[in-house]
A protein has these predicted regions:
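Conserved GNAT acetyl-CoA-binding A-motif
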Residues: 111-123
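Conserved beta-strand-loop-alpha-helix junction that forms the acyl-donor binding cleft
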Residues: 121-131, 148-153
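Acetyl-CoA-dependent GNAT
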Residues: 5, 9-12, 19-93, 104-106, ...
């Protein structure tokens, strides 16, 4: 399931689709982890501005994930001193079908094009499903920031080393 057509580089016209996916996925994934108001009072304008800034910033590569012509998720890669899988979100009905694995392979290919030997990603510690996924994909836990006043802002860091 590593079809490159699955990953379509996002343009400014895709920002609303991405934040629509974000709202849907956050509502099913982060309820009970993030404060409810982050889903219930979702600030569409703020998220659109944030997404447009990423899409327009050459340090970011934003992709819609598509299957059968339908947007089923998105991923964002940030390229700075280290390549970071900034976000990987897949709607629940398409999880456990190889889409996430294909996304990790896509990020690895991106790293290969940049001559990078590894990439990292951050995850909310309470998101046990994502953590288990990253570990199954070969991620090694290399750090944690558990000192934030707001528990949902804490993170753990995984590193993926390319073979």
């Amino acid at each position: 399931m590593t079809d490159n057509k699955m990953f379509v580089e996002a343009g400014k016209d895709d920002a609303l689709s991405i934040i629509g996916l974000r709202h849907k996925i956050w509502s099913t994934t982060y309820r009970g982890i993030y404060p409810d108001h982050m889903m219930d009072d979702f600030d569409w304008v703020w998220h659109e501005e944030k997404e447009l800034s990423r899409i327009n910033d050459p340090a970011y590569s934003v992709y819609l994930i598509q299957k059968d012509g339908q947007n089923i998720g998105y991923l964002t890669i940030h390229q700075a001193n280290v390549i970071t899988l900034q976000s990987l979100y897949i709607v629940s009905e398409y999880q456990r079908q190889g889409v996430g694995r294909a996304a990790v392979e896509h990020v690895k290919a991106f790293c290969g094009e940049c001559d990078a030997a590894s990439f990292i990603c951050y995850c909310v510690p309470e998101n046990v499903n994502a953590r288990a996924f990253y570990e199954r994909m070969g991620g090694t836990l290399i750090g944690a920031d558990l000192t934030n006043d707001e528990k949902w802002q804490n993170s753990v860091t995984y590193q993926f080393t390319l073979a």
